[in-house]
Amino acid sequence: MDHLKRQDEKVFAAIEAELGRQRSKIELIASENFVSEAVMEAQGSVLTNKYAEGYPGKRYYGGCEHVDVVEDIARDRVKEIFGAEHVNVQPHSGAQANMAVYFTILEQGDTVLGMNLSHGGHLTHGSPVNFSGVQYNFVEYGVDADSHRINYDDVLAKAKEHKPKLIVAGASAYPRVIDFKRFREIADEVGAYLMVDMAHIAGLVAAGLHPNPVPHAHFVTTTTHKTLRGPRGGMILCEEKFAKQIDKSIFPGIQGGPLMHVIAAKAVAFGETLQEDFKTYAQNIINNANRLAEGLQKEGLTLVSGGTDNHLILIDVRNLEITGKVAEHVLDEVGITVNKNTIPFETASPFVTSGVRIGTAAVTSRGFGLEEMDEIASLIAYTLKNHENEAALEEARKRVEALTSKFSMYPNL
């Protein structure tokens, strides 16, 4: 980044500092990952200069013949990965992908069934502080009080009672497999559409390690980062009969010109997803998550639902007599990055919380394996149990440094 260094030392310094943070800390935020240098090169390309309102073959600007190729590559690769009939890769985020689906089939005030945020849902699944909860009448379903797993009988009962126009499946903090076939059966029984938000598990679905929602849902939304290991962005997969409506909802509905440099980066990431070694990577994500969960439980920590089926683990820290906020802070102090998170039947403020959410996608990209998961489990437990002991925290910092020093990060940057 020689040009940037000469042009703007302040921005360059901030980027260099962030690179140092990523190299020196253990990244366990479940929604984060490390993209390839090829993805970064595509996103930093001259495509950032091009306006391309519209879609391939039907643009409102001239000179789009090359970006048309890029967008077609991205769409075709997604169709191949997931078996989708239609794909829109223009959403700038997962939230905008969800918004576009809502705008396609809902009217203001329509009833929607979505997962409670503290039970694992997402802001865009009906939170009252989000546009979704303001514009529409969301009814919440959740998890069983004992198993912390989705109670499908309860979902059916609520669907029969409230007759939603749309049912939203998918989550941002649910560590178990979701039965999309069952959700579609429930939707069909009450005459509702089904939308699946697979943002967190898309990479696992792509690798065949989690049930694919595409054959069951009318609409599937996702981010393109997280387990897909692409640039930050979103996309929509749907049945062909909804293609024109979905495309109109994105443009001109809620967006103007697409970010063609980001779409190029998405295309590159999708190409990586189609490679055989991506399946190995995704399997390692799950293996690492299972090993980490086992290690945490051996250390006496409480896990929501008792474990994980995917990349995500939710730790209930109440038995340690600390809050999620304190846990996040003290772990960051020793070099482990996590996020505080609400847990099912939460009683604390969302700014405080009773839980911590972690995931294994990023550390797996870095090359961490089962032995490293054992050490991370030990480190997390040691740090949280000794959160007021500065000598213990200094020891944890040294252990984190010893671990991260074994795995290089972006050596060419």
Swiss-Prot record:
Q: What is this protein called?
A: Serine hydroxymethyltransferase
The protein's job, in short, is: Catalyzes the reversible interconversion of serine and glycine with tetrahydrofolate (THF) serving as the one-carbon carrier. This reaction serves as the major source of one-carbon groups required for the biosynthesis of purines, thymidylate, methionine, and other important biomolecules. Also exhibits THF-independent aldolase activity toward beta-hydroxyamino acids, producing glycine and aldehydes, via a retro-aldol mechanism.
List the EC numbers from the record: 2.1.2.1
The organism encoding this protein is Bacillus cereus (strain G9842)
Q: Note the site residues: Plays an important role in substrate specificity.
A: 225
Q: Which domain of life is it from?
A: Bacteria
**Gene Ontology MF terms:** glycine hydroxymethyltransferase activity; pyridoxal phosphate binding
Which enzyme class? transferase
What quaternary structure, including any partners, is listed in this protein's UniProt entry? Homodimer.
List localization entries. Cytoplasm
A GO cellular component term found in this entry reads: cytosol
Cross-referenced InterPro entries, in alphabetical order? PyrdxlP-dep_Trfase, PyrdxlP-dep_Trfase_major, PyrdxlP-dep_Trfase_small, Ser_HO-MeTrfase, Ser_HO-MeTrfase-like, Ser_HO-MeTrfase_PLP_BS, SHMT-like_dom
Family membership = Belongs to the SHMT family.
Q: Which residues bind (6S)-5,6,7,8-tetrahydrofolate?
A: 117, 121-123, 239, 349-351
